[in-house]
């Protein structure tokens, strides 16, 4: 036992993320992105820089991802990035298990600006407005980017983890 040498511990296997089929297709066609670990259901997740979102979103639409199932925001915590998330589905006739991919765009908290995908998927309309209203993510090129849930004069972004609730809410009687 004393004669045995200590062997270096190999790097963690999870450090290398295998590329899924969509990521491979994007790479083959020259689109800059990063593969992230798949979610618990096996849905492929890719990270895209804000400047490359529109070209990649357009390419994914042309590749068959014709349905934006979900668009939302994530706050990674005070002082950390905000994330704009897009869950895309390839809908086709007689598809038992449609192909899915999730696109994440990490944005700086101080200036969270990303292009709108409204012109690619019309379902992004109210979803981008909700992400703007709750997280303050600005979707450039959106035709009607204004608050959708909170009053127009509301101050702050209620779903940010560093949001401080006002001490006083003015309630009016219904009669």
Swiss-Prot record:
- Which example biological process does GO assign this protein? photosynthesis, light reaction
Q: Which GO MF terms are attached to this record?
A: NADH dehydrogenase (ubiquinone) activity; quinone binding
Entry superkingdom: Bacteria
Task: List the catalytic activities from the record.
Answer: a plastoquinone + NADH + (n+1) H(+)(in) = a plastoquinol + NAD(+) + n H(+)(out); a plastoquinone + NADPH + (n+1) H(+)(in) = a plastoquinol + NADP(+) + n H(+)(out)
Please tell me where this protein is predominantly located.
membrane
Give the main EC class: translocase
The UniProt entry, under Pfam families, shows: Complex1_30kDa
One Gene Ontology cellular component: plasma membrane-derived thylakoid membrane
Keywords noted in UniProt: Membrane, NAD, NADP, Plastoquinone, Quinone, Thylakoid, Translocase, Transport
Enzyme Commission number(s) of this protein: 7.1.1.-
Localization, UniProt: Cellular thylakoid membrane
Q: How does it sit in the membrane?
A: Peripheral membrane protein
Similarity comment text for this entry: Belongs to the complex I 30 kDa subunit family.
Q: What does this protein do?
A: NDH-1 shuttles electrons from an unknown electron donor, via FMN and iron-sulfur (Fe-S) centers, to quinones in the respiratory and/or the photosynthetic chain. The immediate electron acceptor for the enzyme in this species is believed to be plastoquinone. Couples the redox reaction to proton translocation, and thus conserves the redox energy in a proton gradient. Cyanobacterial NDH-1 also plays a role in inorganic carbon-concentration.
PANTHER family linked: NADH DEHYDROGENASE [UBIQUINONE] IRON-SULFUR PROTEIN 3, MITOCHONDRIAL, NADH DEHYDROGENASE UBIQUINONE IRON-SULFUR PROTEIN 3
Please describe the quaternary structure of this protein: NDH-1 can be composed of about 15 different subunits; different subcomplexes with different compositions have been identified which probably have different functions.
- What is the official name of this protein in its record? NAD(P)H-quinone oxidoreductase subunit J
- UniProt organism field: Trichormus variabilis (strain ATCC 29413 / PCC 7937) (Anabaena variabilis)
- Name of the encoding gene: ndhJ
């Amino acid at each position: 036992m004393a004669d045995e040498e200590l062997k270096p511990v190999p790097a963690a296997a999870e450090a290398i993320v295998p590329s899924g089929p969509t990521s491979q297709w994007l790479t083959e066609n020259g689109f800059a992105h990063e593969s992230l670990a798949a979610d618990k259901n096996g849905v492929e997740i890719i990270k895209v820089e804000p400047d490359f979102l529109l070209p990649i979103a357009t390419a994914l639409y042309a590749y068959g991802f014709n349905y934006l199932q979900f668009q939302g925001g994530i706050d990674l915590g005070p002082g950390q990035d905000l994330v704009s998330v897009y869950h895309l589905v390839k809908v086709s006739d007689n598809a038992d298990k449609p192909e899915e991919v999730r696109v994440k765009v990490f944005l700086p908290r101080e200036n969270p600006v990303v292009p709108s995908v409204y012109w690619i998927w019309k379902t992004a309309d109210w979803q981008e407005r909700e992400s703007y209203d709750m997280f303050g993510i600005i979707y450039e090129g959106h035709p009607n980017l204004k608050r959708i849930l909170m009053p127009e004069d509301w101050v702050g972004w209620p779903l940010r983890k560093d949001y401080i609730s006002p001490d006083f809410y003015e309630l009016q009687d219904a009669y």
